[in-house]
Amino acid sequence: MNKFIYPGSFDPVTNGHLDIIERASKICDKLTVAVLINQSKNPLFSIEERVSLLKKVVKGSTNIEIECFSGLLVDFVKEKNANVIIKGLRAVSDFEYELQMALLNKNQAPDIETLFMMSSINYSFLSSSMVKELARHGGNISGLVPECIEKEIIDKFKLK
């Protein structure tokens, strides 16, 4: 069984993330979207909220699960008995960083492969940071995030 892990902070999940999730889920038996608990970041959404948003976005998918993790990614991948890490790339600048991480992961866990997936051209500019900045200032985020969570993102800034 091919088990893939797609890690990220997903703060919030965007249509770019969803594009990678949908495409990756078609080439594996099971895809775990792994939401990183990163103590050094100050996320807009709590880990519970990010997991909940992702579950809402992938509702109805039969081979996708959402989990959170902390610590080393390779340890989580081993724990899940997965064999591939999926990484989405938007631009050359993403590749430089992700290549270094893939090589480090390979050093730590030689049996785990990293598969790079280019973002669809429609989302090659998109990041969670950009979505948050737009939403913070009342910009239009429709088409950038899954429609089913758009209101929750906008409402998050109304509470601040």
Curated annotation (Swiss-Prot):
Entry-linked HAMAP family: PPAT_bact
User: What does this protein's UniProt record list under function?
Assistant: Reversibly transfers an adenylyl group from ATP to 4'-phosphopantetheine, yielding dephospho-CoA (dPCoA) and pyrophosphate.
The record, for SUPFAM superfamilies, names: Nucleotidylyl transferase (SSF52374)
The record places the site described as Transition state stabilizer at H17
Task: Give the protein's recorded name.
Answer: Phosphopantetheine adenylyltransferase
| Compartment(s) of residence | Cytoplasm
What is any one GO biological process for this UniProt entry?
Answer: coenzyme A biosynthetic process
Describe which pathway this protein belongs to, using the record's wording.
Cofactor biosynthesis; coenzyme A biosynthesis; CoA from (R)-pantothenate: step 4/5
From the UniProt annotation, give the residues forming the signal peptide: none
Concerning NCBIfam families, the annotation shows:
coaD_prev_kdtB, cyt_tran_rel
The UniProt similarity line reads: Belongs to the bacterial CoaD family.
